[in-house]
Regions:
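Phosphate-handling catalytic cores of nucleic-acid transaction enzymes
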Residues: 1-295
Length: 298
């Protein structure tokens, strides 16, 4: 029964992709599971998103939610994670931010639930005379941060963190101006699956992250991409780690008002939230402090 349902969905998706000229974009939508393809097609149709932007943002969101739950065995003992560094590129007004926010909305909701739980734990801790272990705030999304605060956030949530910024060039400019490339070195190490160690006078307890998982996603304008070449990122290998997303067409599809726009958008968003909830439900076990036990897939 499930196989028949999936076959029908696959046929429906193919018909929709042909009718909506999805192949003209050159985007390989067929690499996604059929139910995710259906959600992407709905969001593209009813929200007027660029398929390249919404699909890649959703892929990044899954990577952030999955985190270090699974690791990839590349060859022998060589393992890495599913980290993605993504930059959405387009002229002003092309619609980079809305699909990015739509893809990560369930993660923001998850973070908000963690924040409310943290508030309750802090109140209980203070009411108990501040005895016992002080609660820590766990979250996945970070936007405004320093290299040190990023590492502390990741230490509190060893599963993963994602740097999500609307204009990513601002982050790179701040990195070079204030941290002398410290964050870039950490990102290079994390992308390769190496452990991170941070020792600061301001923090008496050193931070050690055995299996870091730091995702990055943000947008930038077409005319600003060249700025990355001026920062030495080509020489240190950062550019080779970035997935650049530039739609083939610089135009936005004509806006069509439909009576069921709101209903269909809500249904697609709810289906997407259920998928990410299932990803978050995957256990990330810690055997001992600073050492995570991960599943490995070839």
């Amino acid at each position: 029964m499930a196989e028949m349902k999936n076959t029908r969905l696959e046929l429906c998706n193919r018909i929709r992709m042909e009718a909506e000229h999805t192949e003209d974009t050159g985007f390989p939508l067929d690499v996604f599971p059929q139910n995710v393809q259906s959600i992407i097609l709905d969001m593209t149709k009813y929200e007027n998103y660029k398929i390249e932007f919404i699909a890649t943002s959703m892929l990044s969101a899954v990577s952030a939610a999955l985190g270090g739950t699974y690791r990839i065995r590349i060859k022998g003992d060589w393992q890495s994670n599913g980290t993605l560094y993504v930059i959405l590129i387009g002229r002003p007004g092309l619609g980079k931010t809305p699909p990015l926010e739509a893809a990560f909305r369930p993660i923001r909701k998850h973070d908000y639930a963690l924040f409310k739980a943290y508030e309750a734990e802090m109140e209980a801790w203070k009411a108990a005379g501040e005895n016992g272990r002080k609660p820590v705030l766990k979250r996945t999304i970070v936007s405004d941060f320093t290299p040190e605060s990023l590492m502390l956030t990741h230490n509190n949530n060893p599963r993963s963190v994602v740097i999500l910024v609307d204009e990513i060039m601002g982050m790179f400019n701040s990195v070079n101006r204030y941290t002398n490339g410290q964050l870039i070195e950490q990102l290079l190490t994390a992308w390769s699956g190496g452990a991170l160690d941070v020792t600061r006078v301001s923090n008496t307890i050193p931070v050690h992250i055995e299996h870091p998982c730091i995702n990055i996603i943000g947008g930038t304008q077409t005319k600003r991409v060249h700025e990355l070449l001026r920062k030495g990122f080509e020489e240190n290998g950062l550019l080779d780690r970035i997935l650049f997303v530039l739609p083939k067409s610089p135009e936005i599809s004509p806006w069509i008002n439909r009576d069921d726009d709101g209903e269909m958008t809500s249904l697609a968003a709810a289906r997407w939230e259920r998928i990410l909830d299932k990803v978050f439900a995957l256990e990330y076990d810690t055997e001992e402090i600073g050492r995570a036990s991960c599943r490995v897939r070839v």
